[in-house]
C-alpha cells in the first residue's frame, strides 16, 4: 500500500509518498465511549505528520471526524469541487482506503472519508461496545467553537451540511448556537457571547471542536459517577436534562450529556 501526504497544516501544497508494509513509525490507540470511537495520537514525523503539527501548534484536541462512505472517490471529488483540498490519501493495491479532506475554513475540523464498514469492522465495533467498562451512551455529535457564527453557518451550508436549527442564544451557557448535521452526526456551531466554559478551548486552540455530545438514559446517575471520580459538572440546565462535564485534563475536550427524552 501507499500513503500520500499532500499538505501541512499551513503553507503551500507538498507531495510525499510512503510505501507501507512492515514496521511503521507511528502509534495510535482507540478509546471507546458508548458507540463513539476516538482515535488517540500523536503521530511522529512521517506519513501522518500533519496531525503531529496540530498537536504541536494547538495542544491536545480533536482535529478530524471520520465517515464511512459507499463511494469514497465520488465523495472526495464532491468536496474538491467545492474548493476543499485533499490532505492525505491511504491506498492498498491501488484502492483508496482513506482520504482526509481540508474542511477547516470555519471550525478547524477536517473530514476523513473511509469505505463502507465491512463484516470484520462491524464485528470489531460490536465487540468494543460490548466491553463491560464501555457505557451505553449514544453519540450525538460535536460542539465546534467558531469566531463568526454567521460565516461558519454559511460555510457549513455551502459544504452540503443540513441545517437543523436557526441561530439561537443560549443564556445559561453564555453562547449562541446553530445545529447542522451530516449523516447521523450533529455539528453544533458555538460562538461565545461572553466568558463561558469554552474560553479555555478558544484561548488554546482558537476555533475547533470543544465538546463531544452524547445522549444518556439517566443524567443524574451519570453525574454521580463522574462525582465519584472527582470530575465536576460545569453547568447543569435548569430542567436537569443537560450538563457539560469538565473532562478537559487530557485533550481539552468537554463532554456534554443530554438525557434521553
Which positions does each model-derived feature cover?
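Short glycine/proline-centered loop/turn elements that form peptide/ligand docking sites
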Residues: 150-152, 168-174
Amino acid at each position: 500500500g501507499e500513503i500520500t501526504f499532500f499538505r501541512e497544516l499551513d503553507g503551500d501544497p507538498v507531495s510525499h509518498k510512503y510505501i507501507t508494509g512492515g514496521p511503521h513509525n507511528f502509534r495510535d490507540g482507540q478509546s471507546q465511549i458508548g458507540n463513539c470511537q476516538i482515535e488517540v495520537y500523536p503521530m511522529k514525523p512521517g506519513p501522518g505528520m500533519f496531525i503531529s503539527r496540530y498537536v504541536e501548534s494547538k495542544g491536545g484536541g480533536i482535529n478530524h471526524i471520520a465517515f464511512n462512505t459507499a463511494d469514497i472517490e465520488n465523495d472526495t471529488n464532491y468536496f474538491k469541487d467545492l474548493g476543499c483540498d485533499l490532505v492525505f490519501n491511504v491506498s492498498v493495491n491501488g484502492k483508496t482506503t482513506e482520504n482526509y479532506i481540508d474542511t477547516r475554513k470555519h471550525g478547524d475540523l477536517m473530514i476523513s472519508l473511509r469505505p463502507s464498514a465491512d463484516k470484520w469492522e462491524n464485528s470489531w465495533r460490536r465487540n468494543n461496545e460490548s466491553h463491560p467498562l464501555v457505557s451505553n451512551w449514544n453519540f450525538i455529535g460535536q460542539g465546534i467553537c467558531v469566531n463568526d457564527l454567521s460565516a461558519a453557518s454559511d460555510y457549513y451550508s455551502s459544504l452540503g451540511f443540513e441545517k437543523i436549527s436557526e441561530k439561537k442564544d443560549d443564556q445559561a451557557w453564555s453562547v449562541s448556537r446553530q445545529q447542522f448535521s451530516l449523516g447521523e452526526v450533529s455539528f453544533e456551531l458555538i460562538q461565545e457571547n461572553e466568558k463561558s466554559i469554552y474560553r479555555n478551548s478558544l484561548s488554546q486552540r482558537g476555533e475547533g471542536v470543544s465538546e463531544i455530545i452524547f445522549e444518556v438514559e439517566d443524567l443524574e446517575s451519570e453525574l454521580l459517577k463522574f462525582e465519584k471520580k472527582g470530575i465536576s459538572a460545569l453547568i447543569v440546565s435548569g430542567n436537569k436534562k443537560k450538563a457539560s462535564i469538565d473532562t478537559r485534563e487530557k485533550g481539552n475536550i468537554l463532554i456534554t450529556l443530554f438525557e434521553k427524552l
